[in-house]
Amino acid sequence: MKTTELEIDRDVVSAKEWEAARQQLLVKEKELTRARDALAAERRRMPWLAVEKEYKFEGPKGEASLLDLFDGRRQLILYRAFFEPGVVGWPEHACVGCSMVADQVAHPAHLNARDTTLVFASRAPQTEIERLKVRMGWQFISWYTITDGFDKDFGVDEWHGTNAFIRDGDRVFRTYFINNRGDEQMGTTWNYLDITALGRQEEWEQSPEGNPQTPPYEWWNWHDEYGNDEASAKVLEQVHRGRAAGGTT
């Protein structure tokens, strides 16, 4: 690939000067990290909105309720992706922005380990969704068809967005919602968990009393090893070594 010369004017400095400049920015980056942590803590104290209506979706196994989408877990994150008639590129492509979001989705095993399920929903029929998932390599994303007014009721009928829910038995509550540029941050396990009512569920978080919490890092595992005690022991050993060395992992 042929490249052209950069038409950018920047100072070229010594390694010592470069490191000094980086350290100045690092102070601001850490401030931003703490601010994000504080914002996530406020989200965890948001009031909840009870979902009173019954909503129906179509999935690979047939009809499903909103409660079914939790797949037995405590929390649900639902991203409204635009893949349906009227979208540019239909039926070969989903919305290009929604497709980029799908390309960056964290492996679901890590969210599942925090009692959280992530799903996508569109108005395309299941046959088209399954075809698209295979072609784009998105087989690990649970993707449902919206069949009623769910998208309008939850602010995602005309634009993409991400809703977070929690359930108490059979009762479902809406706990948070992001859209527009808010969706840009989505993709990592941590950012998904940060918009939920329970958060990352780690002891360092400022969370309401009663939120489940465990020591940080110790719940991590390889995505195909959750539930394997031997693998978990190896992770714990790595965490302890990191702490002994003064690190975080």
Feature-to-residue mapping (PLM):
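Conserved segment of the thioredoxin-like fold in thiol-based oxidoreductases
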Residues: 117-145
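Non-globular targeting/processing and membrane-anchoring segments
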Residues: 1-114, 134-135, 145-249
